Amino acid sequence: MKKTLQIALAATFFAGCASTSVTSSASKDNNELVQNQLFKIEKIIVNGKTFDPKNAEESPNISFENNKFYGYSGCNRFFGSYQTKADTLQIEGDRVASTQMLCHPMDVMDFENSLLSNFKGTFKISNENGKLVLSNDEMKIFFK
């Protein structure tokens, strides 16, 4: 009886561990990747053209938290609202709100203008080589 009880307890323990592992990896979907984290923007591709923020004084970044996003685009701060469903992120409204400073060099402004004017609509959330990527028909954003 004692041996049977030990075997039953061991089987329950291992079955519980196995189901916990499967459940936690299955429940971790791509939209959880964006929640409550600060991401540095590595580069963006807009309509086939690559924009790199290498000359920005501070790395462009974005943070997603409680259906609000906040970021720095190389010169100005920006913010807005979003919703996630399955593997998509929907930017609410037809444009992102931002401060309006003029900055140099011009490639920083080009990066910023391309990012902010195209950061709208629905983006697919994906994980490429361990890095977060947001993409739609017009733009692809690569994060560090």
Residue ranges and their predicted role:
Residues K2-A8:
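Sec-dependent signal peptide recognition
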Residues Q6, C17-K144:
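Lipid interaction determinants
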